[in-house]
């Protein structure tokens, strides 16, 4: 009778116990860390004092059915697929952390081995079931650095969500401001048609009475047609921006817009003092640097040995497995201490080290570029705001003198007959041109306020997005 090894039941029991104990581990990492769903600059690095978030109750609400700027931004952020895409990428990177952490746990594998072997006094074919466990004991930081790199990649994905939110908020604000701009310009253009039409009516009346020439009527009617063409141009731009806003809001058509100046902007360029440390692009560069540093350390650790413990069990399926050695047991168990050292990998380890070093340099440059772009954008917006503010003051002061000249020309044309119709038409057109410029300048200032908030990292605060859940993630200061 064949002698049975007393170690076989022992090892089988040990493997059974390990399988039972490790079963929760196999199922524990089936989701990302819940903390990854809370995103904010202050959570990603040692940030300066965060700008206080607007309370949810402070969110601008619609005036009746009218849509405010902050409400439009929030509506877009709650549904837009670009944010959903960024959140999905975060979940992917979160699972990457679980993959990296799996290196800390035992790796159990099993399978069927078949082949040709020699020894035991002869050569033979053999088939065997194999069950093995491998537990890393020490690897000079390979797994630690892999986890650090995965965590940095997740942080970068978080910063990307903030960047997508900021870009979407800026685009929605632009569309809201432009739609409102052309609403106002269309209203002024309609007033212009009525004003020039009244002058054309007077010119026709005077022509019928013989008090003026037919050329006055032709000139006046030409100005009326020009005013109508202006209205059609503004109508075309209005439809364009209204369609853009509707797409950002996920609607067929947006509701009417609030008429009040958005309090969320509050002359942001005149008080902008944000820190570039809150900018998503800077946070992404910092996360890329941390990831590159971890990958560089991991690549260097690859050149060092890995110490692991490896128990395994083989169960032969051949009927003549012990043909050449009758003392050979069908089930064999062993435990081994492995020291694995890479000898030659075709230069892969060196290449990975160089690649990580280049990525580290690129991350430093990306941070510098992000800060430079933000400073430049902020400086340009503030400089333009200063110039447009002075122009706005001049336009407002000019309105009174233009109105006075229009009234004077009207009396001289109608009562005294000393002023030609062309002067009256020019004065009328100058009034409305000034109103067009006033409305356009005010809208330009609103756009520049959005730029200042964007380039100072304060856009989410201004629109009340902080402290809110957007498509599964919590936005924090």
Where are these regions (language model features)?
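Acidic, low-complexity, intrinsically disordered peripheral segments
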Residues: 2-4, 27-46, 61, 428, ...
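Amphipathic alpha-helical coiled-coil segments
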Residues: 85-100, 164, 168-188, 193, ...
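Membrane-embedded beta-strands of outer-membrane beta-barrel proteins
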Residues: 131-133, 337
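Small/polar (Gly/Ser/Thr/Ala-rich) solvent-exposed segments
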Residues: 84, 107-124, 137-163, 283, ...
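Regulatory alphaC helix of protein kinase catalytic domains
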Residues: 47-75
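Amphipathic alpha-helical coiled-coil scaffold segments and their short linker/junction regions
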Residues: 71-79, 217, 221, 251-320, ...
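Periplasmic alpha-helical coiled-coil/stalk elements that build and connect Gram-negative outer-membrane
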Residues: 2-3, 35-38, 159, 164-278, ...
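Bacterial N-terminal signal peptides
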Residues: 12-21
């Amino acid at each position: 009778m064949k002698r049975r090894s007393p170690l076989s039941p022992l090892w089988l029991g040990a493997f059974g116990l390990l399988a039972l104990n490790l079963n929760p581990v196999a199922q524990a990492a089936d989701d990302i860390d819940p903390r990854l769903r809370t995103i904010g600059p202050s959570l990603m690095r040692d940030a300066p004092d965060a700008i206080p978030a607007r309370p949810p109750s402070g969110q601008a609400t619609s005036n009746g059915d009218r849509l405010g700027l902050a409400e439009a931004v929030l509506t877009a952020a709650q549904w837009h697929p670009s944010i959903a895409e960024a959140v999905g990428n975060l979940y992917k990177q979160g699972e990457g952390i679980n993959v990296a952490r799996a290196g800390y746990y035992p790796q159990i594998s099993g399978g069927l081995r078949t082949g040709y072997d020699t020894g035991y006094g002869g050569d033979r074919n053999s088939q065997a079931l194999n069950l093995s466990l491998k537990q890393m004991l020490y690897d000079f930081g390979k797994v630690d650095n892999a986890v650090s790199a995965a965590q940095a990649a997740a942080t970068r994905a978080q910063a990307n969500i903030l960047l997508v939110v900021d870009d979407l908020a800026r685009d929605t604000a632009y569309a809201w401001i432009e739609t409102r701009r052309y609403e106002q310009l269309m209203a002024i253009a309609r007033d212009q048609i009525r004003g020039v039409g009244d002058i054309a009516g007077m010119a026709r009346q005077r022509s019928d009475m013989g008090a003026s020439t037919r050329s006055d009527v032709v000139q006046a009617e030409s100005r009326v047609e020009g005013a109508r063409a202006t209205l059609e141009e503004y109508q075309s731009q209005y439809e364009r921006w209204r369609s853009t806003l509707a797409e950002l809001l996920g609607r067929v058509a947006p509701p009417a817009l609030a008429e009040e100046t958005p309090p969320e902007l509050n002359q942001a360029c005149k008080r902008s003092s944000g820190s570039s440390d809150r900018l998503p692009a800077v946070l992404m560069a910092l996360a890329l640097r941390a990831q590159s540093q971890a990958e560089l350390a991991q690549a260097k650790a690859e050149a060092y040995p890995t110490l692991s413990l490896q128990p395994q069990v083989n169960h032969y399926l051949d009927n003549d497995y012990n043909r050449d050695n009758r003392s050979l047991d069908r089930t064999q168990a062993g435990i081994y201490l492995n020291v694995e050292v890479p000898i030659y990998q075709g230069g892969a380890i060196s290449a990975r080290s160089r690649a990580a070093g280049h990525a580290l340099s690129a991350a430093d440059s990306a941070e510098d570029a992000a800060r430079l772009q933000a400073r430049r954008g902020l400086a340009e917006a503030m400089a333009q705001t200063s110039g447009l503010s002075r122009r706005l003051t001049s336009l407002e002061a000019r309105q009174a003198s233009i109105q006075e000249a229009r009234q004077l020309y009207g009396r001289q044309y109608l009562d005294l007959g000393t002023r030609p119709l062309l002067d009256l038409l020019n004065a009328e057109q100058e009034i409305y041109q000034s109103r067009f410029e006033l409305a356009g300048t005010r809208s330009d200032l609103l756009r520049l306020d959005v730029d200042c908030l964007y380039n100072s990292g304060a856009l989410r605060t201004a629109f009340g997005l902080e402290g809110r859940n957007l498509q599964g993630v919590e936005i924090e200061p």
